[in-house]
Regions:
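Contiguous, glycine/small-aliphatic-enriched amphipathic segments in soluble metabolic enzymes
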Residues: 1-129, 172-257, 261-276, 281-284, ...
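Beta-strand-turn-beta hairpins that frame and shape the catalytic cleft
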Residues: 60-64, 148-153
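Short acidic/polar capping segments at secondary-structure boundaries
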Residues: 114-116, 124, 150-151, 159-162
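Active-site glycine-rich loop that binds ribose-phosphate moieties when present
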Residues: 131-140, 160-186
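Short, flexible loop segments at boundaries between secondary-structure elements
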Residues: 135-151, 281-295
Length: 324
């Protein structure tokens, strides 16, 4: 359900009653029934509300469910306001959903947005969803991918300050993300994908002239190793030119080295329809590609398009793995 004070609850409620969603899957919403009731937007179908205890004893899921996690006092939730209580609740919903997926009770997890400041205030030190899923599933390697029919990007680093990015780069890490990206796009396209890899510095370093030799030390060796593994990859690309129409059409996905290098062009092209996918997990996880939107929370103004796209992608991935 995401942060209770954000737009997550209302867009999740829409998913529970959306005919196109119900044709694709049987949704199970981990959240708080009290919060959802405050929205005064009841589902038109026969959505059942059960407790966590009842959920643990549930063997068959035959209709949409709301799992009442009782993680927060609904009366104390203030729409659009950051709070430790909401941060903790958002985390607990994720934790319960991961347990369900790892236990094979559900086929995939689709997440609504959490608020990173609220998460930190609650004492939970993960900077975001990607890091939570990686840690709780004990994934050996993972990365964030933003997927759409207009542009697909993946990130070598995510929720860290720009000054910390160079220290997090290594040949092994860049290669991991190239491999994860190629594997995902191979599955999506049913052919060998074309992968581009951005440089870090202006002009991709100009052969070491700008920056700290990151392209020479990390990107070029990783690209060379990926080619040895028969991956169709090109890089380092000049970052400011990589996302022009002519350049991006040469690639099925582009590996970027830090958060905003990938997020800015992606959101300019696919803000409403983009899907966040965590690659490398032992389970399927997709997400909306937007935040909690506190400025419009609980006002009926939120757009659910990204959530519905994330559900559609998750269903497709589950079907590809032979799950129902």
């Amino acid at each position: 359900m995401g942060d209770p004070a954000g737009i997550g609850p209302e867009i999740c409620l829409r998913a529970l009653r959306e005919p196109s969603v119900l044709k694709m899957c049987t949704p199970v919403l981990f959240g708080d029934a009290g919060v959802l009731a405050r929205l005064k937007s009841p589902s038109k179908n026969k959505t059942k509300v059960i407790s966590l205890a009842e959920w643990k004893d549930t063997r068959r899921i035959e209709a949409p469910l709301i799992i009442d996690c009782a993680a927060i006092d609904a009366k104390k939730v203030r729409p659009g306001k950051v709070s430790a209580a909401c941060g903790r609740a958002g985390y607990l919903y994720i934790e319960h959903a991961i347990c369900a997926a790892m236990g094979k009770k559900i086929s995939a997890v689709v997440t609504a947005p959490i608020h990173k400041e609220a998460l930190q205030l609650s004492g939970i030190k993960f900077p975001g969803h990607t890091e939570i899923f990686t840690a709780l599933t004990r994934a050996k390697r993972s990365c964030m991918m933003l997927y759409s029919d207009k542009l697909t990007v993946s990130m070598v680093t995510t929720h860290i300050g720009y000054r910390d990015v160079p220290g997090k780069l290594s040949v092994a890490r860049v290669l991991d993300v190239i491999e994860l990206t190629a594997e995902a796009m191979r599955w999506a396209l049913h052919r060998e994908p074309r992968i581009g890899v951005c440089g870090l510095n202006p002009h991709a370093g100009e052969h070491g002239l700008f920056g700290g030799q990151e392209e020479e030390n990390f990107v070029k060796p990783a690209v060379a190793r990926a080619r040895q593994k028969s991956i169709n990859v090109t890089g380092p690309l000049v970052p400011d030119a990589a996302f022009t129409t002519n350049q991006r059409m040469k690639f099925d996905a582009i590996v970027t080295l830090y958060h905003d290098q990938g997020h800015i062009p992606f959101k300019m092209l696919a803000f409403d329809t983009g899907v966040n996918i965590t690659l490398g997990l032992p389970m399927i996880r997709t997400s909306v590609d937007h935040g909690t939107a506190f400025d419009i929370a609980w006002q009926g103004k939120a757009d659910q398009t990204s959530l519905f796209s994330a559900i559609q992608v998750a269903v497709g991935m589950a079907a590809g793995k032979g799950q129902k």
